[in-house]
A protein has these predicted regions:
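Catalytic loop of short-chain dehydrogenase/reductase
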Residues: 125-157, 174-182
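N-terminal Rossmann NAD(P)H-binding glycine-rich loop of SDR-like oxidoreductase domains
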Residues: 3-25
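Rossmann-fold NAD(P)-dependent oxidoreductase module
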Residues: 15-19, 107, 158
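Conserved beta-loop-beta element that borders a ligand/cofactor-binding pocket
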Residues: 115-123, 154-176
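C-terminal amphipathic/interface module of NAD(P)-dependent oxidoreductases
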Residues: 46, 50, 55, 203, ...
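NAD(P)H-binding glycine-rich loop region in Rossmannoid oxidoreductase-like domains
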Residues: 32-98
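Alpha-helical substrate-binding/gating segment
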Residues: 173-177, 185-210, 215
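Conserved Rossmann-fold NAD(P)-dependent oxidoreductase catalytic core, especially the SDR/UDP-sugar
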Residues: 81-144
Length: 238
């Protein structure tokens, strides 16, 4: 298949591109920076410079790429959690989840694409007495978390409006290139395993929402394990 990978230069996108290529897919990978095009080519992608906020540019990119499916791995978190500008980064990321996802979905639908796999987050469930599953309620959108919760809801609604929309609610990412480094913070997911999950979901998952994280008392990923073989222990060979 021809895969339009939005966010190919990100932490997950850099891992996912070679996984997709290894099983025979062609990857059209996006970046906002012309400086990253060479790196994407090395990974095996056909690079496209486009900004998710540029609806017209994104539409042109889709029409030129003619993809069979879309994988959405876009994030915009330039500042670490201990930065005084972290709140600014959260606001930017929230806008990307809302507007960027909306533009991706519109372009995909215009290009006749039915299947989209998109990243979301698994750490905004309302507290409960057992491990949270995909049908459990999210936190109410209030206080400091309101912007993030509202943005996640908008992202998921947009993706699930696709005929074959698949949402992967990742735990806190860790591994090389993440803010957490090699230290997992539960519910956690290594970036290698997150990329592997997206690759599996592309062809195996049914439309819907999946938790994707390591075993944790607060979160169940049983649905992802059962439906498409999610393996939290997956790592690239050194």
């Amino acid at each position: 298949m021809r895969i339009f990978l939005a966010g190919a230069g990100g932490v997950i996108g850099r891992r996912l591109t070679p996984l997709l290529r290894a099983v025979g897919h062609t990857v059209v990978g996006t970046t906002r920076s012309p400086d990253k095009m060479a790196a994407l080519r090395v990974l095996g992608a056909e690079p496209v410079v486009v900004d998710a906020f540029d609806a017209d540019g994104l539409m042109r990119a889709f029409m030129a790429a003619k993809p069979d499916a879309v994988i959405h791995q876009l994030t915009d978190l330039p500042f670490p959690p201990d930065s005084p500008r972290y709140a600014e980064g959260l606001a930017r990321n929230a806008r990307l989840r809302v507007e960027g996802t909306r533009n991706l979905v519109a372009a995909a639908q215009a290009a006749g694409v039915k299947r989209m796999v998109a990243e979301s987050i698994a750490f905004i469930y309302a507290p409960g007495p057992r491990a949270r599953v995909e049908t459990d309620k999210l936190k109410p959108p209030e206080g400091d978390s309101a912007t993030t919760v509202n943005a996640v809801i908008a992202l998921e609604q947009s993706v699930l409006s696709m005929p074959e929309g698949i949402v992967l609610r990742y735990g806190y990412l860790y591994g090389q290139g993440t803010w957490s480094g090699d230290t997992p913070h539960p519910p956690a997911i290594h970036a290698d395993a997150a990329a592997h999950a997206a690759g599996l979901a592309l062809t195996r998952a049914k439309p819907g929402i999946y938790n994707v994280a390591e075993d944790d008392p607060s979160l169940s990923s049983a649905k992802a394990k059962g439906d498409f073989g999610f393996d939290a222990a997956f790592r690239f060979s050194p």
